[in-house]
Amino acid sequence: AIIGAANSLIRHNRDRFPVEGVPIRRDADPANPSLVVFDGEKTEKESLAWFVKALLHLHKAGRGWEEFAVLYRSRQSSRAVEEALVRAGIPYRVWSGVAFYARREVKDSLCYMRMLTRGDDAAFLRTVNSPKRGFGPKKADALKVLAMREGISYYEALKRHIDEKPFNTKAIREYVAVIEKARASAAARKVSDVFNLIMADSGYEASLQLSGEDERLNNLAELRQAIANYESDADDPTSLPEFLQRASVFAEDIGEQKGPAMKLMTIHAAKGLEFPVVFLWGFSEGIMPSSRTSTMEEMEEERRVCYVGMTRAKDLLILCHSQGTSEASTFRYPSRFFFELDRNLVKLVRPLEPGLEESAKEALMYKDKFLTGEPLESSSWRPGDHVRHKVFGDGEIIAVAKSGAMTIRFPTLATPRTLMAGAPLERISTAGAPTVADSSFSGAPVPEPSAEPGVKDQK
């Protein structure tokens, strides 16, 4: 079923003659064939809960941890998976890459936040010259001598001697001013606000933008999402020290783990490898394929990448999709590649929501016109229009992109959502017209994960 499903996908490529895979395993059990499973959840939190439940179920049934692999399109997608595995106590290793909380930009950002609480020497040395402020090894050595002699931290020594050479430079003074300003307000702010403040005022995020390091910016966005998830999950207002304590658990080094462990890696790193059980994570439009896909040629390459990911599985392939990363995140449809698969070869964990497939295909049709360069009909939607969505309720359009995608503010959600062109919307009133009263959330209740993951043991 896995090879058959992958072949049904790659047949949609037109520019190159598709090379289809042929099942050649001699040890395959005809009574227990390979299986393709699709799991679609409302939120990433629910998707992770089902993922962990499926892992534990399969492990209890006899699967060793070394038999599992999680593959993803890009490295930033590993963050949520790593956190879920740490919480569940499931051993894993990140192959051909670095664990999320060990990545440079993530460690730098967390150290900036640590400077607002403890101001420890390790956090100071990591942040004082990131971005570059002319604080090299000579200045660091001179500061260490002062700190040791006076029995204080490096940062306190810097503040005490800020008017002396070689520390009295404009850039170093600005660093101290940024830390002191953020410290003064951190206790009264949400963690997410503190993070945004320190990233902006320190110039750290801007330095990544100027460098063009998209992957590092994506990891920074993932850390921002982790903070938002932490705040939404907490019953009480969270403090910065509490968040840093939680992050430290995920940041512990797991590289020296001994014994069997799951493998996490990008699809690119998995080329040439095979695993008994594969979870293809982020099987959502905008992730797989990437939202940056702008031509049909690029879309065909995305399809080939997906084909490679699918064919890494020997016994069981699980395609994991969630409509959003949180209750307030951007709405996502399942990957277009899901709709291209031979559905006779795919087992659904639960039925698709009524109307989801039709609305997704309508939106994807509009995107395909954009990819092929066909003239797009001028969007009838304008900022200020009031609309009704069958799941999110009533909202107001606040922006319309050239591609037709719309950013909509729904009173029932904490932040605006971006919906693809062609999303099923009912017009309530046009921009400038009187609006109706905000309606309450009218979406169907989210189904609870089943008692069992709905996946038969595959050996």
Over which residues does each language-model region extend?
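Active-site-adjacent beta-strand anchor residues
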Residues: 71, 95, 102, 281
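Flexible glycine-/small-residue-rich
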Residues: 37, 72, 266-269, 282, ...
